[in-house]
Amino acid sequence: MINNEYLYHFTSSENLIRILETMSLKLSDFKKLNDLNENNIPHYYFINGRRLAQTKNYIKNHCKILCFSQDYLYKHRLLSGINHPRMWAQYAQNSTGACIIINENLFLKQNENILKTTFYKIENIEYTDKLYNISKPNPIYSSPEELLKCHYKDIFYKKHIDWEQEHERRLFILNIPEIQFLSIKNCILYICLGSNFNKYDKLRETIHKLESKCFNQDNHL
């Protein structure tokens, strides 16, 4: 994977309109994940099962993520993050949706007042064929928050190798349960519409309502 400041967010046509109307992306929680092994915490992190249950509950209620694709190498060739057929099928509803290309640095700068108040990371997912790939830590932690800060990479940044073609780059945020959205105002570089996109009239109407241009428009809708 190539981290060159481009973040690719695949979405449905309906969500594209909502995103443009609000100029924001909704954060996801850990209640619904496509990899069943994600955020599974081995029992040896804890002295007793009660602490394990507390930490799992803490993750569900206090942790948020935003997931993106990125550019990647294939046979020594650099391919654009738009070139992800799996993402178009799975997240853009069989190419009826769109892909929003965002500048990572501008995105982080736009939301720095929120992010600087909490613990966050934006890193690439590591793909593995192992169920758990965690070195046994010291099981004594004063709180779930302390544990997650120490081992966020092992818990939140590993997925099964079957998902490798997503080339995921993930923003993980700890302990901001009241925050539901992050702004992408002035962060959008382009919007790539799927080959089966058919909401042109609604998209045109939405764009014309925007008070400022927040992305580059290469064609006339």
Question: Each PLM stretch: what is its role?
Answer:
Residues M1-L221:
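Partner-binding and oligomerization surfaces adjacent to conserved cores of proteins
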